[in-house]
């Protein structure tokens, strides 16, 4: 599955509720008041791993994974910001298993990279660039809802 595409986009309907789970305040500011079909769940002071775990837990609760959590081929120990889109769309058992597998693999990959080389304390200018990169990765998915 391509990392930058919506998952199951052929099954989307206009009345779905989408949620961005993010630790990126730039995403919160940009999409926080986007409209009634899009919510932002902002995890302040959270890391990438926290975002992935929150998204996985939401999928266990019945949410649909709409974007690949490792989009952009950016290693988890390179960018401290992460945004994942989920929705309340219908999930069949095969999709559920696929979504959980994607999330568990992403969590394992994130843990592996962070254990090998923890995130450095980036200066604010670099953090700003990383926030922008993360936001740009989610823009194409948001533009399709």
Which residues make up each language-model segment?
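Internal alpha-helical scaffold of NAD(P)-dependent oxidoreductase catalytic cores
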Residues: 57, 63, 87-145
């Amino acid at each position: 599955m391509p990392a930058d595409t919506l998952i199951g986009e052929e099954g989307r309907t206009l009345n779905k509720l989408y949620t961005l789970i993010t630790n990126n305040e730039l995403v919160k500011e940009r999409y926080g008041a986007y409209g009634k079909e899009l919510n932002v769940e902002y995890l302040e002071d959270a890391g990438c791993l926290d975002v992935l775990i929150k998204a996985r837990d939401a999928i266990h609760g019945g949410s649909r994974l709409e974007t690949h959590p490792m989009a952009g081929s950016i290693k988890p120990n390179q960018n401290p910001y992460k945004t994942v889109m989920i929705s309340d769309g219908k999930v069949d058992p095969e999709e559920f298993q696929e979504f959980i597998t994607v999330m568990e693999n992403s969590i394992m990959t994130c843990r592996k990279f962070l254990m090998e080389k923890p995130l450095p304390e980036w200066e604010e200018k670099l953090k700003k660039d990383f926030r922008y990169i993360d936001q740009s990765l989610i823009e194409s998915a948001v533009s399709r809802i």
